[in-house]
Amino acid sequence: MNKLSTKLVVAIGIGSALYGILGLWGFSIAPNTFIKPALAILTVFGALFGPVAGLLIGLIGHTLTDTIAGWGIWWGWVISSGIIGFTMGLIQKRVGFSVKNGTYNKGDISYLAITGLIGIVIAIIFAGAFDIIVMGEPFDKIVIQVLGATIADVIVFLVLGLPITIGLAKSNKKHTHLKIEK
């Protein structure tokens, strides 16, 4: 593994703190399941800094949320946040894509949307399976949580995460179609 740069470590720290603190707020939709706008942090930071940053922000941030909330650390859900962050960061590996430089195309946006949605589904199914197998949670409760969490995360990703990331990229474009009139 390559050494983590100071900039990347700082980004992971800031992203983890934001994700961890913002993860304390949400709107309940099922037992212990919330629509949490904090998921947008994983999208933005993953797209800005890549899959390793997304993974670590998800893992550290979710652990922070669970610790501060006092309900104990639910490792399946912590790992699922890491998976989501990792998949959101895969976009940064595409040649020509850069939120920082404002370079992207429709294919990049489609790629982010698809990898993000796939990542959410895989991560939430993993968390549910982990809760059933390792934590001994009842199957019927977990089905409701998995469905609720998947719907909630998809909504936050499509309504906040994706548009914010695209907006940042657009605002960082180095050129415009404006022309100076003489």
Swiss-Prot record:
Pfam families: ECF-ribofla_trS. The keyword Electron transport does not apply. It is a multi-pass membrane protein. GO terms for cellular component: plasma membrane. It comes from the Bacteria. Coiled coil: none annotated. The chain crosses the membrane at residues 9-29, 40-60, 71-91, 114-134, 142-162. Disulfide bonds: none annotated. It is found in: Cell membrane. Keywords: Cell membrane, Membrane, Transmembrane, Transmembrane helix. HAMAP family: UPF0397. PANTHER family: UPF0397 PROTEIN BC_2624-RELATED (PTHR37815), UPF0397 PROTEIN SPR0429 (PTHR37815:SF3). Belongs to the UPF0397 family. This is UPF0397 protein BCE33L2384.
